Curated annotation (Swiss-Prot):
Mn(2+) binds at E144, E148. The lineage of its organism: Eukaryota, Metazoa, Chordata, Craniata, Vertebrata. This is m7GpppN-mRNA hydrolase. Keywords: Cytoplasm, Hydrolase, Manganese, Metal-binding, Nonsense-mediated mRNA decay, Nucleus, Phosphoprotein, RNA-binding. Residues 303-312 have a biased composition (Basic and acidic residues).
Amino acid sequence: MEPKRLEIPGSVLDDLCSRFILHIPSEERDNAIRVCFQIELAHWFYLDFYMQNTPGLPQCGIRDFAKAVFSHCPFLLPQGEDVEKILDEWKEYKMGVPTYGAIILDETLENVLLVQGYLAKSGWGFPKGKVNKEEAPHDCAAREVFEETGFDIKDYICKDDYIELRINDQLARLYIIPGVPKDTKFNPKTRREIRNIEWFSIEKLPCHRNDMTPKSKLGLAPNKFFMAIPFIRPLRDWLSRRFGDSSDSDNGFSSAGSTPARPTVEKLSRTKFRHSQQLFPEGSPSDQWVKHRQPLQQKSHSNHGEVSDLLKAKNQNMRGNGRKQYQDSPNQKKRANGVHGQPAKQQNPLVKCEKKLHPRKLQDNFETDATCDLPCSGEEPSVEHAEGHSVACNGHCKFPFSSRAFLSFKFDQNAIMKILDL
């Protein structure tokens, strides 16, 4: 035997019917589906006001409340239709009514605003609601968002920015509203419909019902967001397309005209460096000029007399200016190694046959102070050290700034003449 349920007092039903049902046009009152929508409004009013102000009234759902109204006003069903059947038809019809709302994003585009229904088992979803007769979609979205959050999106809404899905044969369109300050105060305008309003990080929301991201990061099961789940992945895709969250841009959600982020600058620097390497593969333009100048200098010594004069001048310079040369060359070892490591661009075929000679360019002797590599025929030139005293040179002198490759090298004038074909 079923326990007897508490009944809604007749006076309460009279007041509710006069407020929401009896005053509607006759053509709507004769339509049971339209009457059910008005009964739904009466049910919300009963929960918001009568239940709050009159203790002892029974708590009832929409089906029990609709049965009580139809029983109290039998003229609403003149043909004696089955109430359960009418309610099923009304529920099916409701699923076909489009719903419109908004996805509200903060200024960082990383957080989204969700609302929670009043009932204890209600989950989190986007503010939205069913469209009224002859109501424009964007007007419906603005109205529903204002009723559920107290925030007016009319100044933010763009009619072309929305995500539209069909869920269980019901059309749902949510307009995307970016750039709402996170410190905005939200206050629902309807009673007993919205319990909580909170910001949630988009990356912590689930994309499907088995996504356990909110469980690990928010401590909430994914089914708590079942009304929002269908929109999360399309929202991420929309943000990626609109604000360029791709590897090509390197600047997150920055706009097209903003300053490139550091990775972009570094990428440009690396590109310029690679380009310079292609233009000057063997070094800087100055290095190229020096290397080009060296063979020209080598060709300039055209006869034996000029070579002898140059060698004598070299001897005199080393006697008088040894100290200055060492002081003016702070990086002698590095410089000497660099010069020695440069290959000769033009070699006489005789060099290939006489591998033991390994001739050295004349300008190397003049440009480096690495060794005393002058011929010692007839006289022994004296070279001045940094300390000021002279030392006799026999062709095998060693100085602190000498190159290892030429410490034991003896200058052979005859070999040089052969190489120059003089």
